[in-house]
Amino acid sequence: MGVFLGGWYGGTIRRFCCGDIDESEFNASMERWRRLEHTLASSGTVIVKLWLHLGKKVQKARLKDRLKHQEIHHFTPYDKKSAENYDGLVSAAAKAITLTDRVDAPWTVIDAYDGNFRNASVARAIIAAVEAAVAVKRQNAVPVVPTKASEEEIGQISALDAIDLSRTCERGVYKKELAELQSELYDLTYKAYKKGISSTILFEGWDAAGKGGAIRRLTAGIDARITRVIPVSAPTDEELAHNYLWRFWRHIPRAGFVTIYDRSWYGRVLVERVEKLTQPEDWKRAYAELNDFEEQLQEHNNILLKFWLHISPDEQLRRFKEREEIPWKNYKITPDDWRNREKWPAYVEAADEMFLRTSTEYAPWHIIPAEDKKCARLDVIRIYRDALRKALEQKKKK
């Protein structure tokens, strides 16, 4: 159980009350919180939102008393300003409640004048919410699944078939350009660090497509102190006890830092779908949840890049056999790789729908031809370089 004092609403309500954000910014924030709550509730989280209300005179008297003991009660400038503007605070809170009061995350307003009544009311609200959730669970209610495209549309689209895999890169040219790109990348990522521009980069693609090699060449051009690579495998028991995005939320980079995911949250609509590890209503709902998550990343000064490294079935087979024959590459090949290969058509179908539903204007997919690993590595670094240039230029204009 998590208890949040003020939660994700408190800061936004106070900033709106104090005039530091306008109505459109306030409404956009409320919509983000509403979508977040829907994501959490859809995965089984019980959300209890409580507004403890005080009348104007009582609130003023209590604030006056607390200001006498600031060594105990710590106040921020926003706390003081919003408390002095009681009418504005109540108006902002009422607006927030109206915009975010939903069946899966309702608000409960409690009169907080009497402490005993307040405490009992809070307990009753929590008990009622948990009991209601248990009742729904027993009924095996299936959530409504939002969709953006029909099954007919999806069946006619195959993004991977259109990729030209014939490109090659001469080794001498590759080495020269790689060194130049890595040098430029080092400079750009340091400038981004100084400006507080974060980067979240994720890699998906076929087994043996060269994700690890591309990541190594990418990180070679970034200061090790500001970057980290998160290898993603099957979730642990601790991770399974949380919302499926929790294990990725934990690693979102701080301002100026770079996080690279080797596999990502898209496992929800790839391996979990193909291997039937997740119910259809859950992975279908995930498309909208992932788009919301990525939109929030992009809105917070974060470069988001999504790479799919693509190879042909024949090239994958060649690389698998090479891994079996070369002793120092044996660790790279497992029975799971061969089993996944047998499900190639199912993964193509899952990947096509993923591209269709989650390649957005703010977070497009970059499908990289990786039949020649050298070309793929250069493509990845070029795309990141260009994204850094664009972000730094936009930062300069503000």
Predicted regions mapped to residue ranges:
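Glycine-rich phosphate-binding loop of ATP-dependent small-molecule kinases
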Residues: M1-K398
